[in-house]
């Protein structure tokens, strides 16, 4: 994970011509390196994983290691949301302490 130097938001990992590029919603981009490689694996018990994701999403706003972005919650108007990335498709989810969730991807 990379943090944008321009706006302090989390950058999203993308792949361009086999290269890792981190892009931010503000337009900034940074070249990745070998430290940013992702190892994937096959998930066999999808029902169990859905339950684990629910718990992960619910607890995400309270984990200080997760990325926080400056975006107001439409529910409680808190001035930041927690950004997490889940699943093999790397779906970006925005979560608030009040329980609000948004699938950005």
Swiss-Prot record:
<comment type="subunit">
    <text>Part of the viral DNA-directed RNA polymerase that consists of 8 polII-like subunits (RPB1, RPB2, RPB3, RPB5, RPB6, RPB7, RPB9, RPB10), a capping enzyme and a termination factor.</text>
</comment>
<keyword id="KW-0479">Metal-binding</keyword>
<feature type="binding site">
    <location>
        <position position="76"/>
    </location>
    <ligand>
        <name>Zn(2+) 2</name>
    </ligand>
</feature>
<keyword id="KW-1035">Host cytoplasm</keyword>
<dbReference type="GO" id="GO:0019083">
    <property type="term" value="P:viral transcription"/>
</dbReference>
<feature type="binding site">
    <location>
        <position position="26"/>
    </location>
    <ligand>
        <name>Zn(2+) 1</name>
    </ligand>
</feature>
<protein>
    <recommendedName>
        <fullName>DNA-directed RNA polymerase RPB9 homolog</fullName>
    </recommendedName>
</protein>
<keyword id="KW-0804">Transcription</keyword>
<feature type="binding site">
    <location>
        <position position="73"/>
    </location>
    <ligand>
        <name>Zn(2+) 2</name>
    </ligand>
</feature>
<keyword id="KW-0862">Zinc</keyword>
<feature type="binding site">
    <location>
        <position position="96"/>
    </location>
    <ligand>
        <name>Zn(2+) 2</name>
    </ligand>
</feature>
<feature type="zinc finger region" description="C4-type; atypical">
    <location>
        <begin position="4"/>
        <end position="26"/>
    </location>
</feature>
<feature type="binding site">
    <location>
        <position position="24"/>
    </location>
    <ligand>
        <name>Zn(2+) 1</name>
    </ligand>
</feature>
<dbReference type="GO" id="GO:0008270">
    <property type="term" value="F:zinc ion binding"/>
</dbReference>
<keyword id="KW-1195">Viral transcription</keyword>
<keyword id="KW-0244">Early protein</keyword>
<dbReference type="GO" id="GO:0000428">
    <property type="term" value="C:DNA-directed RNA polymerase complex"/>
</dbReference>
<feature type="binding site">
    <location>
        <position position="4"/>
    </location>
    <ligand>
        <name>Zn(2+) 1</name>
    </ligand>
</feature>
<comment type="function">
    <text>Component of the DNA-directed RNA polymerase (RNAP) that catalyzes the transcription in the cytoplasm of viral DNA into RNA using the four ribonucleoside triphosphates as substrates.</text>
</comment>
<keyword id="KW-0240">DNA-directed RNA polymerase</keyword>
<comment type="similarity">
    <text>Belongs to the Asfivirus DNA-directed RNA polymerase RPB9 homolog family.</text>
</comment>
<feature type="binding site">
    <location>
        <position position="7"/>
    </location>
    <ligand>
        <name>Zn(2+) 1</name>
    </ligand>
</feature>
<keyword id="KW-0863">Zinc-finger</keyword>
<dbReference type="GO" id="GO:0030430">
    <property type="term" value="C:host cell cytoplasm"/>
</dbReference>
């Amino acid at each position: 994970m990379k943090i944008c130097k321009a706006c302090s938001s989390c950058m999203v990992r993308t792949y361009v011509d086999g290269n890792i590029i981190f892009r931010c919603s503000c337009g900034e981009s940074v070249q990745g390196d070998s430290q940013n490689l992702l190892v994937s694996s096959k998930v066999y018990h999808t029902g169990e994983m859905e339950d684990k994701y629910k718990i992960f999403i619910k607890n995400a706003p309270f984990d200080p290691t997760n990325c926080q972005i400056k975006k107001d919650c439409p529910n409680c108007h808190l001035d930041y949301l927690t950004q997490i990335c889940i699943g093999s498709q790397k779906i970006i989810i925005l979560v608030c302490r009040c329980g609000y969730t948004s699938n950005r991807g």
